[in-house]
Swiss-Prot record:
Recorded GO MF terms: cytochrome-c oxidase activity; heme binding; metal ion binding
Gene Ontology CC annotation, any one: mitochondrial inner membrane
Topology feature Mitochondrial intermembrane, residues: 28-46, 112-130, 197-223
Keyword match Transferase: no
Gene responsible for this protein: COI
Provenance organism: Sepia officinalis
List of residues binding Fe(II)-heme a: 47
PANTHER family attached to this UniProt entry: CYTOCHROME C OXIDASE SUBUNIT 1
Record-given protein name: Cytochrome c oxidase subunit 1
Keyword line: Calcium, Copper, Electron transport, Heme, Iron, Membrane, Metal-binding, Mitochondrion, Mitochondrion inner membrane, Respiratory chain, Translocase, Transmembrane, Transmembrane helix, Transport
Length: 223
């Protein structure tokens, strides 16, 4: 699975690099190249999501973690190999949803933070932002399952006599990252779910006209 993570991460990295080149060519000379601000915003948004959720996290945590953590602990494999499998296979459909979000309507041009009111029904009436939110949900589920797996592996699968203070710093870095992920990702999931219901079910969590607070989203997002 570690190897699959690397392959997926490299493929996503090439996709992200092509988006990055589009951004650089647009900004690299005076005047407009794309001639469409919405399209440019969609490229910037997709670039942010692809590079974070489909390049950095799968390679740095998924790839190196799956290869090195069991090796450094003296474990034969991760604690939950089948959950590990599922963590990986949630990522391709997540990336597909993200690419679909940029293809339908005029794309999700909200910036990678998906702030309301830019991500509200008024600015993005079609399903593009909803697809981006579902993509984030899948990537988040994948990350949370992976984090649970890493924490359990590091706590329970060490050689006998291998104390926590003797673990390599890489294992510690994965361990602490996984704990922080488990703390923060459910809050982000709550924020984008509230945004989803604001868009589709007439709630007003982030809509001032209904007593909501758009700044609340920023608090939840950056938590």
């Amino acid at each position: 699975i570690g190897t699959l993570y690397f392959i997926f991460g490299i493929w996503s990295g090439l996709l992200g690099t092509s988006l990055s080149l589009m951004i650089r060519t647009e900004l690299g000379k005076p005047g407009s190249l794309l001639n469409d601000d919405q399209l440019y915003n969609v490229v910037v948004t997709a670039h942010g999501f692809v590079m974070i959720f489909f390049l950095v996290m799968p390679i740095m945590i998924g790839g190196f973690g799956n290869w090195l953590v069991p090796l450094m602990l003296g474990a034969p494999d991760m604690a939950f190999p089948r959950m590990n499998n599922m963590s990986f296979w949630l990522l391709p459909p997540s990336l597909t949803l993200l690419l679909a979000s940029s293809a339908v309507e005029s794309g999700a041009g909200t910036g990678w933070t998906v702030y309301p009111p830019l991500s509200s029904n008024i600015s993005h009436a079609g399903p593009s932002v909803d697809l981006a939110i579902f993509s984030l949900h899948l990537a988040g589920v994948s990350s949370i399952l992976g984090a649970i797996n890493f924490i359990t592996t590091i706590m329970n699968m060490r050689w006998e006599g291998l104390q926590m203070e003797r673990l390599p710093l890489f294992v510690w870095s994965v361990f602490i990252t996984a704990i922080l992920l488990l703390l923060s990702l459910p809050v982000l999931a709550g924020a984008i779910t509230m945004l989803l219901t604001d868009r589709n079910f007439n709630t007003t969590f982030f809509d001032p006209s209904g007593g909501g607070d758009p700044i609340l989203y920023q608090h939840l997002f950056w938590f």
